[in-house]
């Protein structure tokens, strides 16, 4: 039996995205720009480089107000050209 994400969450709730992308200076700015469109706020994302330094992982936590917001952000963050994966 599959459990859907919206069945596990009670809104509003803190929700963290981990965005993996190319190690370019604009990665963090592009992630924050997309998040600001759907969940305006003051964000201080954390950034971790990969072991070889080719990729960066950007973690950012929002205060999610509904499941559609969570799903839209997954989609739009994944559409950033230099992003490889969103968890």
UniProtKB/Swiss-Prot annotation:
Disulfide bridges in this chain: none
SUPFAM superfamilies in the record: YbeD/HP0495-like
GO cellular component, one term: cytosol
PANTHER family, per database record: UPF0250 PROTEIN YBED (PTHR38036:SF1)
Family stated for the protein in its record: Belongs to the UPF0250 family.
Name of this chain's protein: UPF0250 protein KPN78578_06520
Species of origin: Klebsiella pneumoniae subsp. pneumoniae (strain ATCC 700721 / MGH 78578)
